[in-house]
C-alpha cells in the first residue's frame, strides 16, 4: 500500500484533474502534461574515493535504503567483512549509493551518512535540488522496473546493472513546488495507513478476546446454551488466503542487509 502511494505520487502527482500526456515510455504511461523527463545521466555523476577504513561501514537494505551496518549482528551479516577496508568506497551524506548486483530489487538510495561500502557498489554525486524527492521517486516501483530492464545476467540472482543502460533511464521531473508538496504528502499518507492498521489490529484483538471469553463462559457454564437452537448450515471447507499477507510482506520485508 505504501509503495502504491509513492508510485502514484511521483508519476501522476497529487492533482487528479490536471491534463495528462503520454510520456513516450511504456513503463511510465501518461504523466502530467506540465512535467518533464530527463535522463539519469543528467542527474547522476560517478564518484569513486577509497582509503577511508576509519569511516563506519554502511549497507543497503531494500526497504530502508542506506543504513549504518551493525557489524556485531552476526545473524544479519551474511557477507564476509575483510580485515582491510581500505579498498572500500567512500559514500558522503547526500550521495547516491547502489548495489549494482541488486539494483533490480531496489537496493539503492540517497545516503544520510558518510561511510564506506563494498567496492562492488556504484556511488554517484546527485545533481538534483530536492534530494528527498529524488530518493522517494527513484525508489518507487516504476524505477525498480527500469533498473531490472537495465540489468544483464544468466540468472536472476546474478544480474549486473549496466551503467550505460542506466544512464539512459528517464526520470520524471515535476515543478519544484510540486516536488515539495509530494515530499510533505507521503509521510502524512504513510501515517494514515499506519494508524488504520493499528486500529484494525486492535479491533481484531478485541474480537479475539470477546470470542475467547464467550467460549470460556459457555464451557464453564456461566452461559446456559441448552435451550439455544442450532441452525442448519452447509459446511464449507476453508482455504488459506495469503493475498493480503503477501501484499503486506512487500511493505515489511526482512532487513536483508547487503554489502
Pin down the residues of each PLM region.
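Short, well-ordered beta-strand elements within core beta-sheets of diverse protein domains
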Residues: 26-30, 79-82, 122-126, 167-173
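A cytosolic small-molecule/anion-sensing beta-strand core signal
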Residues: 35, 92, 219
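A short beta-sheet element
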Residues: 88-89, 93-166
